[in-house]
Amino acid sequence: MSEYNFTKIEKKWQNYWDKHKTYKVNEDPNIPKEKRIYILDMFPYPSANGLHVGHPEGYTATDILTRYKLLNGFNVLHPMGFDSFGLPAENYAIQTGEHPKKITEKNIEKFKEQIKALGFAYDWDREIRTHDENYYKWTQWIFLKLYKKGLAYIKEMPVWYCPDLGTVLSNEEVIQTPDGPRSERGFHKVQRKPLRQWVLKITEYAERLIKDLEEIDWPESVKEMQKNWIGKSIGAEIEFSIKASKEKIKVFTTRPDTIFGVTYLVLAPEHNIVDKITKDELKTIIAEYKDKEILKSDLERTSLEKDKTGVFTGAYAINPITEEEIPIWIGSYVLGIYGTGAVMSVPAHDERDFEFAKKYNLPIKQVVSQTGNNEILTKPFTENGISINTPEEFNNLKTEKVKTKVIEWLTKNKKGQKKVNYKLRDWIFSRQRYWGEPIPIIIDDDLNEIPLEEDELPLRLPEIENYKPSDTGESPLSKVQNWVNVKRNGKIYKRETNTMPQWAGSCWYYIRYLDPNNEKEFASKEKINYWMPVDLYIGGAEHSVLHLLYARFWHKVLYDLGYVNTKEPFKKLINQGMITSFAYQDENGILIPNDEVKKRDNKFFSKTNNKELKQIIAKMSKSLKNIINPDDIIKEYGADSMRIYEMFMGPLTDSKPWNTQGLIGIFRFLNKIWAIKNKELTKESAAKEIISGLHKTIKKVTEDIENLNFNTAISSLMIFINELLKHDKNYLEIFKPLTIILAPFAPHLGEELWEYMGEQPSIFKNAKWPKYDPNLIIDNTREIVLQVNGKIKDKIILNKGINEDTLKDIALKNHKIMQNIQNKQIIKIITVKDKLINIVTK
């Protein structure tokens, strides 16, 4: 009897797949559209840390589906590449002087080695790297298309600048904390600073970015996050004249019905009209206030907890309907980057306005009430209701009716109009760094921008000695004079020295996979039409707003220009749950690194002070020393064990804690399959109940893979394997289809068993997914309740009459049971045949 030598088996088949290019895919025109599928992973940033066990979760899910589809006769595109521009490599280069390209490519080789060790079915001939000049040539080409369409422009604007990173950050890359704003990467302090920036007009696509969410199969939570980020609101834009001035102030409001209750206007301190309208005697006070407030973060200025502050400008606006004079203030809680940078303040019907009016003793005029009567207001009434204290034609009407009539009046009298507003801001697209795509623009002495010609692409990064940004905040490229200065037609131009953000390369990489070696086009129309859109995209929920929104924006631009054939890039999106790890917390809630923890009598203690610690579930992190390295797992248990364990831990979309005990159970499961292989292989007919069990398992595994319910598919395989172990022989008519349905989960073992049965490799080229016969499926199952200390923790379907030992084995490996008995002593296990199992612990 041979042993299950997973190391030898896995190396053998990985070498075979590489040598024979088993997973190379071509655009076979004879394969109909319904038999093609594009399955995509969010490609990784190749960090120096390599993979931890959380990374392959999504990759394993797509790999199982890929192999399943191959066995069902599909042409499957399943590529992999690397999002290889980025700050970490540049920061390391600043510290060491080593070129970011060299660092990045070394990291990529480590990533590839780890990914290949897990046996994923990638077509490596389609690998892309965003830092490769043959790739970023086309990123630059897309930028030029955006520029020529009027969607890329230069603007001096207040931006988030991080001195430690030496670059500008987009709003999405800044985290608001109680201690002020910080960079998402590195958690460094950031500040507001006016800088010349390239900006992309994503706002032009705001409505379509919302509307087209209806056409795609994405998690509702992600759709809501995108809708909230875009922040659509419908209302009116109203124009207020200014007393004794030709200037006008535009205000956006979602409640035009409350215009009769406006008692003051508030402008953002940075509003361009402030200096023009401020009375001379107040200019010093206003200037001091502006200087102080502009340095604050948006969150600090708009926080509901913060005290609202403001200063009167001395100027007055005129209410366009009532013609009342209204004082104009500037206030911290109004931001220049949102709406028009001005608000009409109705303290009777808005909480912030109410608070501000109370503080500065400004009038409060009620114009809406629930009953239609005047009421004593102790707090603002912010709901819809009945209009009061308004001109006769607007009085005693419901809110929606008043809104309509006010907008009609404003439009007729040219004082305003109906308006849709978006919270979304244009995308700051430039970075003051070296390690990014150069922007293909040159600039003359008059600051006119001249785009490079397409035959001048790629504009390559020059070699430089120092990767640190200049003291002025400019890119390191600004110091390379022989690169910056360009002579044309006897004139000297300067190159744009900002580079693109890391998001640029990931906005379109899914298209380049279709045609990665094309030197004439970013991808041929034939290949785009053959594969697009991406049928399934799997990645983390942390990309819900940033990458996914930006990629949708670029795709829509390319669609409008006729370069792609679909309005949306990703048909279906799945967010895999996070794989967490155990961490340890002291009595003050402080997390203690794992290497400072010792275990004694099923309890955990600090090595430093011997105090007992609480075991909790936390995100894997270097600081907590709780990262699990897949290399170690593969070495001890094999890639197939790790793959199956990650899928068996729980539903794909759930977060779940890593537990090596569960992995050991999976390793035993694969050894059981090997034990069946070691039995006498016979062509005899199997018993009726075995055949029935096989067809039932095929049905369950097929349905579960289609629905990405991998954990329950594995569970049904386990149940059937346990039944097969009871028999002395290995029936070929059972083992062959069983091997095929096992192969997507454990591809190395699947190939080995396929070859053992005398079949020609690869199983993924030469086998066909078995079909179940409904007539052979006998309903021989029961729902078993799993309890811990009498409380229901889960329910599972098992074969009727399952023996007690098998039931105990399955229950103790169940994810929810394992969570509930972790670090507890099992006193006894009570079973009621075909009904329940109760695990009693203390």
Swiss-Prot record:
Gene3D superfamilies: HUPs (3.40.50.620), Isoleucyl-tRNA Synthetase, Domain 1 (1.10.730.10). SUPFAM superfamilies: Anticodon-binding domain of a subclass of class I aminoacyl-tRNA synthetases, Nucleotidylyl transferase, ValRS/IleRS/LeuRS editing domain. One of its GO terms (biological process) is leucyl-tRNA aminoacylation. Pfam families: Anticodon_1, tRNA-synt_1, tRNA-synt_1_2, tRNA-synt_1g. InterPro entries: aa-tRNA-synth_I_CS, aa-tRNA-synth_Ia, Leu-tRNA-ligase, Leu_tRNA-synth_edit, M/V/L/I-tRNA-synth_anticd-bd, Methionyl/Leucyl_tRNA_Synth, Rossmann-like_a/b/a_fold, tRNAsynth_Ia_anticodon-bd. ATP binds at K622. GO terms for cellular component: cytosol. One of its GO terms (molecular function) is leucine-tRNA ligase activity. Its main location: cytoplasm. A motif ('KMSKS' region) lies at residues 619-623. It is found in: Cytoplasm. PANTHER family: LEUCINE--TRNA LIGASE, MITOCHONDRIAL, LEUCYL-TRNA SYNTHETASE. This is Leucine--tRNA ligase. It comes from Borrelia turicatae (strain 91E135). The gene is leuS.
